[in-house]
Amino acid sequence: MVVRTGTCSFCEYRIYPGRGQRFIAKDGRGFFFLTKKAKCLSLRKVKAQKITWTIARRRLWKKVKATDIAQKKKKRNVTVARAIVGISLEEINRRKNLDASHKKAEAEKAVRELKQKKANDIEKKRADRKLQGKDVKAAKKAETKKTKQPVGAKGGKK
């Protein structure tokens, strides 16, 4: 039969069923003390390491094996590849596994495409400007023809 035991909050001894005293502080923290002596020392805020009979003191002076203290396992971050908006997971993996020469060739290809696109945009703008310029010139000519001034004598006042 296994007996459920607790540990004293001050001296760290085992507390068997029917023993000890539970203390709840004003801030809601719960303590479990083995004896009245442990409770009084804890409430007076005496450090357990300064009291010779506590396990904290024995641990400080290396009288207790360090293997008794459980060590926490380190959390290791696991990297997971996920798709990004616009690029699928397969595309990301393909780009990761490319050789340096392939990467360089792809980069050059992308640069060439960008330059070509810019050149096309510039030519388009120039063509639009030429068309606009012709329209403006034609409109000006039409205005000048419509509003011809009457020919009269040149000169000053009479």
From Swiss-Prot:
> What is this protein's record name?
Large ribosomal subunit protein eL24
Q: Which family does it belong to?
A: Belongs to the eukaryotic ribosomal protein eL24 family.
**Residue ranges, annotated region (Disordered):** 98-158
The UniProt keywords, alphabetically, are:
Ribonucleoprotein, Ribosomal protein
Q: What InterPro entries does its record include?
A: L24e/L24_sf, Ribosomal_eL24, Ribosomal_eL24-rel_N
One GO cellular component term: cytosolic large ribosomal subunit
Basic and acidic residues bias (residue ranges):
98-146
Keyword check for Amino-acid biosynthesis, yes or no: no
Keyword Ribonucleoprotein in record: yes
Q: Which GO terms describe its molecular function?
A: mRNA binding; structural constituent of ribosome
Q: Which organism is it from?
A: Tetrahymena thermophila (strain SB210)
Gene Ontology annotations of biological process type: cytoplasmic translation
